[in-house]
Amino acid sequence: MRYPPDHKTVARAKLIEAGGALAKKAGFSNTGIDALVAAAGVTTGAIYSQFRSKAELLHAIVERELSRTVEAFTGKASKELQRVIAWYLSPRHAAHPEGGCPIPSLGSEIARADEEARLLFEGLVKQLVDALEVGTAERSKAWALLAQSIGGVVLARAVLNSET
C-alpha cells in the first residue's frame, strides 16, 4: 500500500500533537510508545521513522508546546495580558493540562532532561518573558508573573481541596 506524499509529515505532526497532550496530562516519562501511537492514530513504525529516540520526541514536544504558549502571550498589552493570565490561572486550565501550557506539567522533567532539551526550553522561556515584558513594562515583573502563574497552576493541580 502506497502512502500519500505528505504521510510522513502528517504522521510526525500527529505524534508531536498526541505526545504533547499525553505528556502534559500524565508526564513524559510515564508516556509509553503504545499509548502514544494509539493516541496519534499511527503505527509503531511511524514513531521510529520520525524520531531517533524518545529524547528527540521530547525536544519536538517542548518546541511545539512552548512555542504555542509564547504565541498566546505575544503582543499583549496590559489589559489583554490580564485576560490571558486569568485564563492561565482558571480552574479549566488547571483541570485540563493536556490543553494548556507545558511548563507546569513538564518543568520538572525538563530539569532532568538532556542539555539540548534544557537549552531549547530555556530559550523559549526567555521568549515568553520577552512577551510578558510587553504587558508588565519591566523584566523583573515579567519573571515574577511567570513564576507566580506557573506556581499557581502547579498548586491548583496538586491539592485535592479547592478551598486549600
Language model segments and positions:
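Helix-turn-helix
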Residues: 14, 18-56, 60
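Hydrophobic alpha-helical connector segments
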Residues: 60, 70-100
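Amphipathic alpha-helical segments used for helix-helix packing
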Residues: 83-84, 94-122
